[in-house]
């Protein structure tokens, strides 16, 4: 495997931040655009804003929700600066606001709520949305297929590729197509998609698939050298947060994956082929964290599209832990996505 392909799955390197001050950070590397896009990947902004804020809260505080807005398209040719503002420090909750800048202009903002970790004995009322039979489940090979091979069969097959090429010029570019394959095969996320993922003829209100993160991330709280310090000084601010030393990096990784193949799935609910949009931009992104997301395990995702109107589309996702069957996170995103008429798309495809 080439160095460039290995770098595609190096999440720590992709998201790495350099401190400018205790509350300001700059990206170490340029923020990449996803395949087929000109702007910075939204998941990079969401996850880096969370990572920046984690550098300013004590070890025993965990994120419970994140509300963010994409204000201006990110420039992949310029590093991003993040400023973390402390809104409130309480005994049980901490509120942070993170602002991202390029060229001295605000491009993204997020508000993040952290809650102190409580003892299990404290919990009184409990309820978890659970999917029966999901516990310990692996993707059914009769219904799901690894994304790389599915893309090659359902999109890159010469006969089918010509149909996609009629919708967009990028499908006439062999280099661009190889980038899609590389992203599926070597990228941060590994997917198991339903076999009709790229073009579904059935009418449905729900899309489900499996996803996990390839690079290993610890689930042991404060697994690095700071573990003993955490035991005696839980309110200590960490010196560093990496996939190896802090289980809270799972939240960062989840924030990254939560913006991938979410808004892009809108055509699935309208019996249109994926990638048939002419313009797409995310407007906002909200995450509710219900538990520590173990991102190296398969995560089962159920997506719905409650509303599409006047080029504004709302998608919602429920993410379930396949080890327990319990819901681990809920995500909502609205985007401004422009499509041609359904009749024209179907006629071309």
Swiss-Prot record:
<feature type="active site" description="Charge relay system">
    <location>
        <position position="259"/>
    </location>
</feature>
<feature type="active site" description="Charge relay system">
    <location>
        <position position="282"/>
    </location>
</feature>
<dbReference type="GO" id="GO:0019395">
    <property type="term" value="P:fatty acid oxidation"/>
</dbReference>
<dbReference type="InterPro" id="IPR025652">
    <property type="entry name" value="TesB_C"/>
</dbReference>
<dbReference type="Pfam" id="PF13622">
    <property type="entry name" value="4HBT_3"/>
</dbReference>
<keyword id="KW-0719">Serine esterase</keyword>
<feature type="short sequence motif" description="Microbody targeting signal">
    <location>
        <begin position="347"/>
        <end position="349"/>
    </location>
</feature>
<comment type="similarity">
    <text>Belongs to the C/M/P thioester hydrolase family.</text>
</comment>
<keyword id="KW-0378">Hydrolase</keyword>
<dbReference type="GO" id="GO:0006635">
    <property type="term" value="P:fatty acid beta-oxidation"/>
</dbReference>
<dbReference type="GO" id="GO:0005782">
    <property type="term" value="C:peroxisomal matrix"/>
</dbReference>
<dbReference type="GO" id="GO:0052689">
    <property type="term" value="F:carboxylic ester hydrolase activity"/>
</dbReference>
<dbReference type="InterPro" id="IPR049449">
    <property type="entry name" value="TesB_ACOT8-like_N"/>
</dbReference>
<comment type="function">
    <text>Acyl-coenzyme A (acyl-CoA) thioesterases are a group of enzymes that catalyze the hydrolysis of acyl-CoAs to the free fatty acid and coenzyme A (CoASH), providing the potential to regulate intracellular levels of acyl-CoAs, free fatty acids and CoASH. Contributes to growth on fatty acids.</text>
</comment>
<dbReference type="GO" id="GO:0047617">
    <property type="term" value="F:fatty acyl-CoA hydrolase activity"/>
</dbReference>
<feature type="active site" description="Charge relay system">
    <location>
        <position position="333"/>
    </location>
</feature>
<dbReference type="GO" id="GO:0005739">
    <property type="term" value="C:mitochondrion"/>
</dbReference>
<dbReference type="Pfam" id="PF02551">
    <property type="entry name" value="Acyl_CoA_thio"/>
</dbReference>
<dbReference type="GO" id="GO:0009062">
    <property type="term" value="P:fatty acid catabolic process"/>
</dbReference>
<protein>
    <recommendedName>
        <fullName>Peroxisomal acyl-coenzyme A thioester hydrolase 1</fullName>
        <ecNumber>3.1.2.2</ecNumber>
    </recommendedName>
</protein>
<dbReference type="InterPro" id="IPR003703">
    <property type="entry name" value="Acyl_CoA_thio"/>
</dbReference>
<dbReference type="InterPro" id="IPR029069">
    <property type="entry name" value="HotDog_dom_sf"/>
</dbReference>
<dbReference type="GO" id="GO:0005777">
    <property type="term" value="C:peroxisome"/>
</dbReference>
<dbReference type="GO" id="GO:0006637">
    <property type="term" value="P:acyl-CoA metabolic process"/>
</dbReference>
<dbReference type="InterPro" id="IPR042171">
    <property type="entry name" value="Acyl-CoA_hotdog"/>
</dbReference>
<keyword id="KW-0576">Peroxisome</keyword>
């Amino acid at each position: 495997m080439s160095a460039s392909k290995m770098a595609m799955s190096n999440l720590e390197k992709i998201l790495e931040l350099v401190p400018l001050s205790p509350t300001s950070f700059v990206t170490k590397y340029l923020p990449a655009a996803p395949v087929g896009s000109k702007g910075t990947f939204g998941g990079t902004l969401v996850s880096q804003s969370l990572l920046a804020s984690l550098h300013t809260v004590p070890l025993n505080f965990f994120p419970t929700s994140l509300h963010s807005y994409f204000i201006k398209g990110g420039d992949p040719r310029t590093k991003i600066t993040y400023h973390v503002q402390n809104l409130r420090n309480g005994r049980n909750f901490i509120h942070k606001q993170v602002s991202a800048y390029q060229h001295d202009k605000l491009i993204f903002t997020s508000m993040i709520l952290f809650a102190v970790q409580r003892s299990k004995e404290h919990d009184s009322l409990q309820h978890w949305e659970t999917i029966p039979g999901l516990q310990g489940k692996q993707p059914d090979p009769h219904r799901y297929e690894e994304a790389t091979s599915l893309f090659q069969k359902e999109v890159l097959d010469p006969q089918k590729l010509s149909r996609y090429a009629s919708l967009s010029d990028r499908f006439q570019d062999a280099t661009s197509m190889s980038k899609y394959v590389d992203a599926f095969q070597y990228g941060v996320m590994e997917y198991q998609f339903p076999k009709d993922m790229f073009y579904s003829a059935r009418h449905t209100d729900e899309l489900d698939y499996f996803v996990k993160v390839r690079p290993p991330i610890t689930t042991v709280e404060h697994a690095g050298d700071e573990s003993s310090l955490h035991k005696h000084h839980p309110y200590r601010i960490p010196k560093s947060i990496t996939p190896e030393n802090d289980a809270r990096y799972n939240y960062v990784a989840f924030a990254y994956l939560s913006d991938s193949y979410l808004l892009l799935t809108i055509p699935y609910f309208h019996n249109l082929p994926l990638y048939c949009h002419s313009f797409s931009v995310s407007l906002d992104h909200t995450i509710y964290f219900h538990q520590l997301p173990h991102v190296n395990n398969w995560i089962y995702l159920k997506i719905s599209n409650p509303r599409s109107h006047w080029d504004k589309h709302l998608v919602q996702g429920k993410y379930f832990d396949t080890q327990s069957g319990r819901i681990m996170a809920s995500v909502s995103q609205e985007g401004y996505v422009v499509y041609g008429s359904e009749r024209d798309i179907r006629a071309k495809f």
